[in-house]
Amino acid sequence: MLNIVNVSLPSRCRIICISDLHTHWQETKKLLEHCNYKPDEDYLFILGDILERGDDNINALRYVMKLAENKRVIVISGNNDMFVHDFAVGYNQEKFCGYFNKKPNRCFMEMAESIGITDFSEQADEKRKLVYETFKTEISFIMNLPDAIETQQHIFIHAGIEGINWHNMTTKTAKNLHRFINLNHESDKTVICGHFPCYNAGRQNSNLPIFDFERRIIDIDGGAGVTLASQVNALIIDKNDDEYNYQVKYSPIGEAKTVISDYSESRTWYYADRKQAFSLLSPDKDTPTGFIKVRNNETNAEGVVPECMSGYWDGDWHVWANLNSFPSVKKGESIWVYAEYGEYCWCITESGEVGSVPKRVIDLM
């Protein structure tokens, strides 16, 4: 059975909801400032995955712990948040060594390194206990987080719900349910979740929250630390009696650049999933240098994609960027750059779109 916090909201209030910051606490702090967050008036719900996928775990955790001292702030746990406890005290020695050698846990290792431990090949149990004792307050905070928040009209959860009696589902499902945005649920309430990056859902060419009112689902995962171009999203809910209005703010990861001239290219973008198989086509006059032209073997959609965002395995080509992603920008707008290839950059634009923008229209200095 899930550990659920029930909140009876007043007739008028504002809820700010964020999720999947994945150690990016500074962007989260900027985002809350952008939302004009008022700790004495607003509710703040953080839907898990505070940790991992980044390199500032300890500071991120302590930042969230400080926020949570306010009774109007509720933090729930995500699947990535559980790893630090498992590595500290959950796994037996054999499992610890197996996982650790395969993929060292970033948060646990960050904690260990902060007290001078860099190797667990000897005296692993003693060292793990020392890490746990040193960070017992932080690890206990994570382990005591609830699984969900329920209000009059909404369910807030990390990954999603399952079944009419969703209160009784396992915590593992609550934290790991895959692609919930594409599923149906039996509750009459709107479910607000993270866990699955919005860019990967194929609904839009951006990381912005997805509103599926037919399914009563809102996904707010901006892909921070997961997708190449990523951000932390905030869903702002203004409650006025029985009316709920939604607003979105976001904070891209990284430093903003400036667009120095207008750019627009009319191409239709097509969703691409790295698990799908693609065929490599011959380039034509509309294939920019540094790009390849491909066809999706499932949908037959054709388009171009940066060659650096493609790979060949299992006898097929695969890509991990949407086809024909060339968002429009205007002079003076902000833009965030994540990769450079040929004459283009992979960016998040001020409108939130993700894609290739020519270097010549960006002040990269």
How would you describe each model-predicted region?
Residues 1-62:
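N-terminal active-site segment of His-dependent metallophosphoesterases
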Residues 17-19, 44-48, 74-79, 157, ...:
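Active-site neighborhood of phospho(di)ester-bond hydrolases with catalytic His/Asp-centered motifs
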Residues 22-26, 52-55, 81-85, 163, ...:
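Active-site environment of divalent metal-dependent phosphoester hydrolases
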Residues 53-146:
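Active-site neighborhood of divalent metal-dependent phosphoester bond hydrolases
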Residues 122-217, 224-228, 240, 244-251, ...:
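Acidic, His/Gly-enriched loop-helix segments that form or flank divalent-metal centers
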Residues 260-277, 281-284, 310-341:
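SH3/SH3-like (including bacterial SH3b) beta-barrel domains
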Residues 275, 290-296, 332, 345-349:
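SH3/SH3-like beta-barrel fold
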Residues 295-327, 336, 349-365:
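Boundary regions of SH3-family modules and the immediately adjacent low-complexity/disordered segments
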